[in-house]
Amino acid sequence: MKIAEENIDYHVDFIEVKSARYIGDYAIRVFFSDGFTRLVDFKPFLETSLHPSIRKYLDETRFKDYQILDGNLNWNDYDLIFPIEDLYKGNL
């Protein structure tokens, strides 16, 4: 019996956050590596959260202090981070 091995080259495009711009009122315009852009409104997520480690980002100065790290929006060394797919869909 001969076992056939099929070589299939899979090409997977990983989408990353390339840049982001704070617009105001807890909204950030996110620019993705595939050229797509999404305006993400974080305010409803922050306001409905009951957890103090999330609610602290209702301090606008703290919220605006994000960075792009490993292709994603990141607050305070992974203290607050969202799945890229959720950012892409604008559904937090």
Predicted regions and their residues:
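Motif-centric detector for short Cys/His coordination patterns
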Residues: 1-92
